[in-house]
Amino acid sequence: GVIMAFVFGGVLAMALYSYLMNGRSVGLIHSLPLKRQTLFFTQLLTGFAMLTAGNLLVVLVSLLVCGEPGPLLVWLAVVTLAEIFFLALGTLCAMLTGWLLAVPVLYVGINFLVMAVMQLIHWLAELFIYGYQANDFGSFTMWCTPVVQLARRLTDSQGVIAEYVGYPIVSADVSPLENGGWQALGIYVAVAVAILALACMLCIRRRSELSGDVAAFPWMRPVLRYGVGCMGGLALGMILYSVTFGLARTNDIRAYLPGMLLCVVLMTLVCSFGMSMLLGKSLKIFRRTWKGTVLLTALLAAVCVCVRMDVAGVERRVPKTSEIESISVQCSRANSFTATSEDTETIEAIRAIHRAVLDQMKDGDVDLDGALVEDGQYIWIRLKYTLTDGSALERAYNVPVRRASALYTAINHMMSTPQVRQTLVFSGEAEAGAVPQGGTIYSLETGDFRNLTAAEAQSLYQAAWQDVEEGNVISDILTETGYTLLQVDINGRNWDCALDTRYFTDGAKTLAVLDRFMRNGWSNADGLTETTEDS
């Protein structure tokens, strides 16, 4: 499918235009009485015919087995359109260089360039911005990464084609229009036409004497020199930092700026001068390139300083209530939950926690050197905002929470809201007006269990909801809840949920109902009822 189209698009481009990479062969071919555009399209159509012939052979052989042409024709159309795009992109890469080994490097680099840049930005932000967490790549990044975008659109569980073992498996009940597969192919084919027009123009203007050079055009030299210097300097610089300064400063909430600058500057110099030597085919390149390399190094150092100083205000940003569609919260010593924009009380409580964490960080109370906190505990908090414009903002903090601190008060206020009290007690599907039809109480300590009748399950379920509404649920984040020895499950017609008895307060109605049920007896592993005497 898509992966094979990606591979053969690059390999065929190398084979078809290999004559451009050798001075003798390009001199011979270009001495023939043929226009360059004629040579260009002859090679292109030859490669496309080779790819299509193989696909047609697969279809003909498959027809002998399944005899159903419809799905096979869908597969043929999809794979052919994907191959048109990747062959066009490989052709463009072959026009940009005169060195055969540079073609696959350019081909892979162009396919993943935007994604690689975004990943470097995320890594740099995670090193310098307190609590920063990288989100999924946005739609723009995915569209600029064709092989990933097409693979997602065409090979997922609801896509057009699923390729598992090297040959296409097409299901008759899979619609080729699901997930915008045809639209994505149409867009990339239109882009392929533009790419081929650009490649043809470059082929006409290409200088034959530059065959064998890494850059087939003079303007490609600074692009490659500074592009490799920038990407390589940042990537290798962060890797070097992680294995040197990073290992010695594991408890820092941010990267050590002087160490990061040293690593980035060193790797930028290595990558930039190394690329200059490759482009110039000489070791004597310092006089011609040192000014641009120093400027690039200073620029990357300035970027690191700006990210460390949080010039854009990324670290301090707390989205406004009007911008929030929902917030997903993960917190140690509490269950995960999601608050929607309709629940303004919980939203405001979460925003208060976010502000309290930042204020505590501003005061310097984020030391991670010790595992123990006086009169408190380290709490891990992860917040994922889904905003109304479709974007997302994610933060994760490991902070000391001390009693009487603003953060302690903010977390406890969030835990006392109705939605959070519900998520602490109930896991699964639970609604206040639902009618249970049964349930089970299981002792993890002895292995005994008790099956609940519909009436017993309903009384237990109602008691739990009353405790949630009346606030008979622990709302202190530093309270040790320990482990529960009872597993309580309640089920209805089309739903089921579990009760977490750890979070009920001592006077909760739910605990009283459970105690009454257990006094009436258990069923052991043999199905026999055992009555427990009152203590």
Sequence positions of predicted segments:
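Membrane-interface segments at or immediately adjacent to transmembrane helices
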Residues: 305-388
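Hydrophobic alpha-helical transmembrane segments of polytopic membrane proteins
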Residues: 74-99
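Long, hydrophobic alpha-helical segments
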Residues: 2-25
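Internal/C-terminal transmembrane anchor helices
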Residues: 225-232, 273-314
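Central hydrophobic cores of alpha-helical transmembrane segments
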Residues: 101-114, 265, 287-300
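Terminal transmembrane helical anchor/hairpin motif
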Residues: 1, 115-202, 206-216, 234-263, ...
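Selective transmembrane-helix segments that form parts of the transport pathway or gating/packing helices
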Residues: 36-65
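Short, structured surface segments that line ligand/substrate-binding pockets
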Residues: 363-401, 472-502
